[in-house]
Amino acid sequence: MKRTTRSLFIKTLSAPALACVLVSPAALAQDSAPTFYADALPLFQKNCVACHKPNGPKVGGITAPMSLMDYDQAKLWAPMIKNALITGYMPPWGAHERHRGEFKDERYIEDNELATLVAWVDGGALQGDPADTANNSGMVAEADGGVIPDSGWWIGEPDLVVQFDRPVYVEDSIMDWQPTVQMPVPEGAHTKPKWVSKAELAPGGPWVHHIVSSHMGVGVPGRGPFSYPEGWGVLMPEDPFITVNMHYHKDPGEGTAVTDMTRAGFLFYEDGTVIDHVVETNLLPHSGWTIPPGDPNFEVNNTFEIEEDIYLLSMGPHMHYRGKAMRYEVVYPDGERETLLWVPDYDFNWQFLYEYKEPKFLPAGSVMHMSWWFDNSTQNRWNPDATAAVEYGPETTDEMANARIYYAPTTKRGIVVGGEIPADILETAQKEEQTRRERANLLDQSQDDLSWLSEDSE
């Protein structure tokens, strides 16, 4: 079976989407058919135009295919909008309904909310009177999650921007390539260690499968920026380079070559801020299994013992094209069992980082239980090859069972930004960058650098 690359770009163009929709009860009470200006546009403004706007921002390297601020475009895409809503393709969010209210930037839609936009489409996607939006001018600013600033970065104007010193060329013959590349820091821009409060990765295109870095987190399709709670942060030592592991994935063949200029932006804490919790991460990969050919519901399980009291900040499930569902659970020392995250319909193109609104306390002696399900059958239309026996591996046509977590010990460090940095924190941050650099095969297309699979999981 010939493999077809599944990219968010292709999926987005074939089934365009809304970011999320909400509607007031008054809209449902109208006797006449809903109109764009009176009913649809206010909903788009409040929940969708952060992405669906002219020259909209990239999310995981992808830009929304239409602007929902424009009536002509919204009407043109109206049938697809309806399809995206009723099929559950949008809003893009993997966490089960049971988690409503737990995570930041959640995207859920009520039945009556969906009904209003479907009614607008079924009623002929009527335009209505532009004056009907006069009282809705403030809705964008008030919407949860906000609208991307004029800077083009979700985090706002960065304190530091880094990028490759030259475009990375991904040749025609390449399907999967995982080089490690250095991003030079502009001279004089980073002369002392800084505490990162927010970090944003801007992949150069949909062929960027992932980006892994010690200081800026992980970039995968559909994932937004890292924004740490007040008093939480990551130390970025002064250095002329930031080293990143890239994974490029595309269909090989004549004319398929691409060039990448991935960027990253950082916001730093101001002097005087107190850092109580230094963020740590663990990939928690699980290997040593084989998915049989044609198996529609293959399950693997793993555990991780928590050795000290921690605050769990966020969770990031990761599988490839056969990924079907994923669950994090915890068994507390007293035997109580709790589901931390249930993703019943995993989508490789929307690999969210599920961040708690309030970091969750997990006491020492707790055990995390992770379960992954895979669909290697012909019923999975994204399956590269249902006849293959599939193992854990780095290529996109392999599979992975990773359960990355971000967390911090509960003991407060009380580190004052601009003051002395504890030796253990500085040493760890410097070692992470140096280790990544020493393991790297910098821009050597003869070899992949797969060290990221084990570096933070030992």
Regions found by a protein language model. Give the residues of each.
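N-terminal secretory signal peptides that target proteins for export/translocation
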Residues: 1-10
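Bacterial N-terminal signal peptides
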Residues: 11-25
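Hydrophobic/aromatic hotspots within intrinsically disordered, low-complexity regions
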Residues: 22, 28, 450-453
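Aromatic- and Gly/Pro-enriched helix-to-coil junctions and flexible linker segments
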Residues: 28-186, 191, 198, 204, ...
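Extended, polar beta-sheet/loop recognition surfaces of beta-rich domains
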Residues: 69-89, 382-388, 411-417, 422-425
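His-enriched metal-coordination microenvironments in redox/metal-binding proteins
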Residues: 120, 146-413
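Glycine- and charge-enriched low-complexity intrinsically disordered segments
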Residues: 414-443
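Long, low-complexity, intrinsically disordered segments
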Residues: 442-458
